[in-house]
Amino acid sequence: MHSRTNCLQTSVRAPQPHFRPFTAVKTCRQRCSTTAAAAKRDQAQEQQPWIQVGLGLAAAATAVAVGLGAAALPAQAVTSEQLLFLEAWRAVDRAYVDKSFNGQSWFKLRETYLKKEPMDRRAQTYDAIRKLLAVLDDPFTRFLEPSRLAALRRGTAGSVTGVGLEITYDGGSGKDVVVLTPAPGGPAEKAGARAGDVIVTVDGTAVKGLSLYDVSDLLQGEADSQVEVVLHAPGAPSNTRTLQLTRQKVTINPVTFTTCSNVAAAALPPGAAKQQLGYVRLATFNSNTTAAAQQAFTELSKQGVAGLVLDIRNNGGGLFPAGVNVARMLVDRGDLVLIADSQGIRDIYSADGNSIDSATPLVVLVNRGTASASEVLAGALKDSKRGLIAGERTFGKGLIQTVVDLSDGSGVAVTVARYQTPAGVDINKIGVSPDVQLDPEVLPTDLEGVCRVLGSDAAPRLFG
């Protein structure tokens, strides 16, 4: 998701590239920094957690003016339904990352669909748009009916009714739907769902081959209603588990933090003068994350803790700009993330020299549920040598989508680019490898529990 704003002027905030309708974004190879004033424009970007469909959206609610331009249209009169179809076609034409369009002639497809697909009613037009996008064979470039677009926006705002599962595809050819991350404290996490679990059925409906939006619809529902989810651990299809879950409406608290005192020597940085560690848990990147993280790092910096533990385990991403903002709080200079499309590197987001704490020893906890904007953050901290990455390899979700609003309230999520770390590593399907191998469950995620373990004989060696 990434649309950024005038690269030639000073700033654009970064995570989710900004929003200048992606369609209007021009190639920019110079480094761009961002200002706090740009923050609000970034807030509508990328996916979010409670049943957040794992899109990795970068501009989740970006309104893009999709003009028909000068492209030649059929000689016959164009109906209002066909105009809506053309809006969707043009959104992909302008922004899609693969300019070969999966080996198809995008212009020829437009003409073919206008001539052959019935578009007399809105439902038929929607169906024609879905068929057009299916040609791309890209599960993340999808049509969003008005209700689904509204649900996506609610997710990036921080609350949604569901069972607390963020879902995505497994990356293989089977189109299995897997748990990207269970939302902390959500019904699914409490029932034992884990990152990487394969979802088999939802209320008896087999989900393999369904779109993520269809599965999301099955999982969402009225607050306090029940839903049955059958799943299994990766590689163990014969060992299914059945979870009886109660849907809840929650507001996601993106940041929690504390100071752990009397920390065991094994968990401290070498030569630490204090037995204190600052622990910051980032559960998601939503519209509240930047301000909350700023408060956390500012307070811990004032305390002069011996080290920082940044926990982004099971953080499935969210607003790309928030991920970059957090990186800027910890890194004072250098590149943080590269945005690449079919033509190569198009944008570079860098530190802005206004970090809160760029010196305190830092370890970043990750696992297979660390994805998208969280991987951007982990990659930035690793490649800048700001901190050690501890845990297991992250998920590997590096595609960027932007959501283009259509005139009737529907939208199209379009894959527009991909993330790369400052060292040029393509995150997608690869992830970020840890510097320190660590059992991802060695530390709890609640504040009291993590301090208890860090102060015990079971404290892990975090800083190498």
Swiss-Prot record:
Protein's cellular compartments: Plastid, Chloroplast thylakoid lumen
InterPro entries: ClpP/crotonase-like_dom_sf (IPR029045), PDZ (IPR001478), PDZ_6 (IPR041489), PDZ_sf (IPR036034), Peptidase_S41A (IPR004447), Tail-specific_protease (IPR005151)
EC number: 3.4.21.102
Source taxon at top rank: Eukaryota
Transit peptide, residue positions per record: 1-32, 33-77
Keywords on record: Chloroplast, Hydrolase, Plastid, Protease, Serine protease, Thylakoid, Transit peptide
Regulation of its activity: Not inhibited by antipain, 4-amidinophenylmethanesulfonyl fluoride, aprotinin, chymostatin, 3,4-dichloroisocoumarin, diisopropyl fluorophosphate, E64, EDTA, EGTA, iodoacetamide, leupeptin, pepstatin, o-phenanthroline, N-ethylmaleimide, phosphoramidon or phenylmethylsulfonyl fluoride.
pH-dependence annotation: Optimum pH is 6.2.
Keyword Ligase: no
One of the Pfam families matching this protein, by short name: PDZ_6
Annotated GO CC locations: chloroplast thylakoid lumen
Domain PDZ: 149-234
Principal place of residence: plastid
The keyword Transcription regulation is annotated on this UniProt entry: no
Assembly with partners or alone: Monomer.
Family statement: Belongs to the peptidase S41A family.
UniProt-recorded name of the protein: C-terminal processing peptidase, chloroplastic
